[in-house]
Structure formats: C-alpha cells, structure tokens
Curated annotation (Swiss-Prot):
Residues 26-288 form the Pyruvate carboxyltransferase domain. Heterohexadecamer of 8 large subunits and 8 small subunits. The modification N6-carboxylysine is found at K196. GO terms for cellular component: cytoplasm. It comes from Hydrogenobacter thermophilus (strain DSM 6534 / IAM 12695 / TK-6). This is 2-oxoglutarate carboxylase large subunit. One of its GO terms (biological process) is gluconeogenesis.
C-alpha cells in the first residue's frame, strides 16, 4: 500500500469511530522484568529485586508479563549465580493471577545452538510445570522449521504458543515475504502471531501495511501483536499505526526502562489509547506506582547502563542493534583495537550479506558481529572463521533468508561446493543430547539430578558445572553491584591498589564525567600503555607511561592478570597458538606429543558467547599445552606451543 492510500483509509476509519459503537480493547503485555531490564541493565537485576515489582504487576491486569527466557537463563548462571528455575518458581508465587511469559529461541530453546526435539519437549514441559503459560517462539533466520516442534510441544502440553516473525530490511525481505511467513505460522496452528522488530527500523506506514496484510491473509482468525524496539525513535508511532491496522496486542515496558533499545513506555501507550475505541482499561495510577519501583531498581543497577541503549537514528543506516554495538566495542577494547570500531561497524552489513541477510538478533547478531570484528582485527576477511559461521554455512542453524556468498561457501565447504539447507537444523543436532546431559550431570552431582538440573547442563554445560560446584561448596557469589564513584581524590604519593572506573574531575571550574573503558595489554616497564577513556560520553584513546600501575575496576586487565597467575606464558614463538580475542577455553583438542598440521584446529575458545576455533600456526609436534578448559585467555597468551620438526612426519 502507498502512503496516500493508507492515509485515506485511516480517514475513513476515523469517520466510523465518530459514529460511535466501535470498540476494540487493545491488550498489553509488559516486558519490564525480562526484555526491559535486558535492554537497559544487561539482564543483571537479581530475583530479590524483581519480586516486589512482579507482585505489584500482578494487580494491574496485563494480558501477560514477560519474566523469563532470552538471556535471563544464561545470565542467572554466568553472573548472578542463581538457579533460573528457582527464579521462575519464586516469581510465580507472587504472580498467581497473571500469565507468565518467556522468550523461547525455537530449536535453540534459550541457548545459542539447535537442540534435539526431545530436549525441546523436556524444556517446554518443565517450563509449564514451573509457571510459564505464554511462549514467544522465534527463529533468528525465520526458518519456520525451527519453531514448528516448539509450537507443537507448547500446544500439546497446555501452553500458549506465540510464534514470531523477525523483521529486517534487505533486498530479499519484501512485503510478500512477510505474508508468506505469516501463512506458514497460521498453518502450524500457533495461538498468536507476533510481528517482531528487534532492531527498531520498521517505519509507520510499513507497519500499517504489513499488519493489515497479515490480518487479511490469515482471514482475521489469528490474533496479531506488535513487538517493536525503539532504537530509531519511531516505535510509539508504529504502535498507533498497528492499532489502526487491526493489531490485537502491543508489547511495552515501564517508563524508567523504556524507549531506545527497549520499547515504548507502558504508561505512554495506555494514555495514548485512553478514551478511544481502543482503550486498554489499565489504570494509569497503578502504572505510576510500578514506575516508582522500577526507578529504584534502575538506580541500584546504574553501572550497567550504556550510551548505546538510547535512541540512535544511525540504526536506520547500519541496522545494528544497540546491544550488538556495545558487544563489538567490548571485544575491540579487549583486543586493544578500539580504533577499528568504525571499520567493524562497516563490515557488519558485508558479513550479513555474505550470510544471506539474517535478521540481527540472537544468535545471528552474535555470529555476524564476532565475525565482523575478526575480519577487521585479523587484517583479512575470513582469515579466521568462527565455528558458528562454519556451522551456519553447513546448515546447522537452519536455512538463511537468502543465498550464501559463493566465495565464503567454497572457503568453508571446498571448491565448487554449495550449501545444502534441505535438512532441518534439529536433525543435525545430537539426538542423544538429553541422555548425555543426564549422565554427565549425575556424575557432577554424585546423585540423581532433577530434570531442571539436566536442562541447565544441557544448555550451558560450562556455566552449569561451575554453578553446581559452587553451590555444593556454599560459594555462590553473584557479580557485585558496585555503587558509582562520584568523585575521586588522590593524595600525593598515594596510589590505590585498584583505581575507580568512573569519577568526576574539575578543571578550571568545569566538571567532566570520566569513565575508564579499558586498558591495553601490559607493556614493558617504562613503555607507554593505551587507556580508553570516555569523557562526557566521548571515547578517547590516550597513551600513558605509568610509574605506579593502578588497575581500573571492571576493566579487561584482571583477565590478563588471571592468565599470568595461572602460569600461561605470553606468545613469543612462531609455534605458539593464540586466541584472536579474549575469551574462555572450552576445549583443548590435542595433547603434548601429538603431531599437527598447520591450520589444524587445536582448541576452542568462547568469546562473547561464540565459539572460535584456534588453529595450529605451524606444522609439527605439540611441545607444551599451557591451558585447560575454563581458563581465561587474552590474544597475547600462548595456549600451546608447537615445535617445528625438519624431518617429514606422518599426521594421524
């Protein structure tokens, strides 16, 4: 539909409204406890701080409240040292009257890689048992084969399946493409269709046309909702256009955590529709009470806020979500290459095109972002290819929306070979993943595990094992929530052991907010070292020759220090295998004495939730392995050392 046609159609609708008699209550799902805090506070809000909010939200009358899934499962284990299943049970206790909703990543469940159908069924069963009613099910590639099993399981086990279409903008994503996706979802029997723009780049007239088209194509029998992040600042206008196009429900977030990388404010949307034929029936006074609770939460977790979470209209050009940008910045700081951020951002659309234009949301945003960073810092495109990109091209994530770059496909699959996406991703997953996870969890715990414990391990084995061991020892210590250091005074001759990461300085009567974002790797004594400092929001790189070293709290340096303390030497020899960026060792694939070929994969390192293959820099014999699974490493650490041997050797 053209904009002029849409405007004329809306005029006619308003004439009908003026006659009276038309009423359509718009339903509201509030996402504050999950997506709101994920967008604005890095998902770091602890369960104890969420419970008072959830208890108050139970009295408002939302259609549902999203409290679980997405990154919460991972973050609970990795940073908060909480059992995500216990979180869900505790929330359900204080919200008996409201449907609880979770974000479900299709065949990936809440992880980053496809799992077996058996694992999907097990997870859905336990989620419903522990309190979830509504499942928002999506696949990052819009390969609906990846959500079909989940939708079937949810319906069979008594849940409510909201199947999602993930919006993006590319030459292959046309109006007709969205309608085709919608018809596939209607055919699989979903209870609702969610149209999701996770990046925040859809425009109002397009919103109207697509929502109206979906409603008409599905015969008005399938309820439709809009999930629209606000990165470009147009989401609340999209909400209004969706309402006029016939949408049935809107996703919102309470105002202290709304807008920008998050969603339109619940209060704003409710007020916008109040007194109209679309009145939500929600009491604004109750929303104000909720907002006061959220304000206090935001104050406590202020350290996790970032400038990338605000409105940024540049997203309309580069299509990169705020969270993805902040991840890339963190990677480049730790790799001592922040000066390459613009190159990395420019590389993102190139990688996205090479991979067939996937929408940039989990896990495709991580796959594209990490590869773009590697392409830039290695100095050559696809010189280093992540395991995830290889798996993606081999079809292990599903079928991309468009064709894979021929050059990239041949680099991974071999000359003249093309990707085969005819096989469903789940059929390439380990069919025995549940059984293996059960046995390994039992061995770790030394007893029969619960289904929930097996699921923790099946989805996040390293993090779950760490959690189980720490829980057994009574050593579950969550990541500290440090208060912001407002001012810092350093007396002459006194240098603190750990310098503050955030402070104010006064220079000629003017105040400047300063934040140390990162520090480069250690240099030789007396040599300058790069510090990345943000002054009033502007990032600067400075070189300092320190006489006494002060380590900023929260910077990447402690990881390097940890590596040194564990006896991991710095890479100095041609045969030293290194990681392309800071990360955690997942697997070491060789042992001392093994013969290896140049380019052979010798280890796997996880960085930014993606697995990177570490290759042998030369052919020879593994002389020494310096790391083990669980070790944190930086790019200048030697993971293992290979000794070149002159005589011809045979490789097994």
């Amino acid at each position: 539909m053209q904009a002029v046609e849409i405007m004329e159609e809306i005029r006619e609708k308003f004439k009908e409204f003026e006659k009276g008699g038309f009423r359509k209550k718009i339903l509201i799902t509030d996402l504050t406890p999950r997506d709101g805090q994920q967008c604005k506070l890095a998902t770091r809000v602890r369960t104890d701080d969420l419970l008072p909010l959830c208890e108050a939200m139970d009295k408002v009358g939302f259609y549902a409240v999203e409290v679980w899934g997405g990154a919460t499962y991972d973050v609970c284990l990795r940073y908060l040292k909480e059992d995500p299943w216990e979180r869900l049970r505790r929330i359900k206790e204080v919200m008996p009257n409201t449907k609880l909703q979770m974000l479900f990543r299709g065949q990936n469940i809440v992880g980053y890689r496809p799992k077996s159908d058996k694992l999907v069924y097990k997870f859905v069963e336990r989620a419903i048992k522990n309190g979830i009613t509504v499942f928002r099910v999506f696949d990052a590639l819009n390969d609906n084969r990846n959500i079909k099993t989940a939708v079937k399981a949810i319906k069979e086990l008594g849940g409510e399946a909201h199947a999602e279409i993930s919006y993006t903008r590319s030459p292959i994503h046309t109006y007709q493409k969205w309608i085709e996706y919608a018809l596939e979802i209607a055919e699989m029997g979903a209870d609702w269709l969610s149209f999701k723009d996770a990046t925040g780049i859809i425009m109002p007239f397009e919103t109207y046309a697509i929502i109206k088209g979906i409603k008409e194509a599905t015969g008005g029998k399938l309820p439709v909702l809009l999930h629209n992040h606000d990165m470009s600042g147009t989401a609340i206008v999209n909400h209004m256009m969706a309402v006029l196009a016939g949408v049935d429900m809107l996703d919102t977030v309470l105002s202290p955590l709304a807008f920008g990388s998050s969603h339109p404010a619940t209060e704003s949307v409710v007020a916008m529709l109040e007194g109209t034929p679309f009145d939500t029936g929600i009491d604004m006074k109750k929303l104000d009470e909720l907002a006061e609770i959220v304000k206090q939460i935001r104050k406590k977790y202020k350290k996790y806020e970032t400038e990338y979470a605000g409105v940024n209209a540049k997203v309309l050009i580069h299509k990169i979500p705020g969270g993805m940008i902040s991840n890339m910045v963190a990677q480049l700081i730790e790799a001592n290459a922040l000066d390459k951020i613009e190159e990395a951002l420019e590389e993102v659309p190139n990688v996205e095109r090479d991979l067939g234009h996937p929408p940039l949301l989990t896990p495709s945003s991580q796959i594209v972002g990490v590869q773009a960073v590697l392409n830039v810092i290695s100095g050559e495109r696809y010189k280093v290819i992540t395991k995830e990109v290889r798996d993606y091209v081999e079809g292990k994530y599903g079928k991309p929306p468009g064709p894979i770059s021929k050059e990239l496909a041949e680099k991974i699959l071999g000359p003249g070979k093309e990707p085969d996406f005819s096989i469903r991703a789940a059929d390439l997953a380990d069919p025995n993943d549940w059984d293996k996870a059960y046995e390994e969890t039992k061995a770790i715990l030394g007893r029969e595990p619960t289904d929930e414990e097996v699921l923790l391990y099946a989805l996040f084995p390293m993090q779950a094992k760490d959690f189980f061991v720490a829980r057994e020892k009574g050593e579950l210590h969550p990541e500290p929530v440090d208060e912001l250091v407002e001012t810092t005074e350093v007396k002459a001759g006194v240098v603190p052991g750990a310098a503050p990461v955030e402070f104010e300085i006064v220079y000629h009567g003017e105040k400047f907010k300063v934040k140390v974002e990162g520090v480069s790797a250690h240099q030789e004594p007396g040599k300058p070292r790069k510090y990345y400092i943000r002054v009033d929001g502007r990032l600067e790189e400075v070189q300092i020759t320190p006489h006494v070293e002060a380590i900023p709290k929260g910077g990447p340096t402690p990881t390097a220090v940890q590596a040194e303390e564990k006896g991991i030497p710095k890479a100095t020899q041609p045969g030293d295998a290194t990681a392309p960026m800071p990360g955690r060792v997942v697997r070491v694939l060789v042992k001392e004495g093994d013969k290896v070929k140049e380019g052979q994969t010798v280890a796997i390192v996880e960085a930014m939730k993606m697995e990177n293959e570490i290759h042998a820099p030369i052919s020879g014999v593994v002389e020494k392995v310096f790391v083990k699974p669980g070790d944190n490493v930086t790019p200048d650490d030697a993971l293992l050392r290979i000794k070149h041997i002159e005589e011809e050797v045979s490789y097994g």
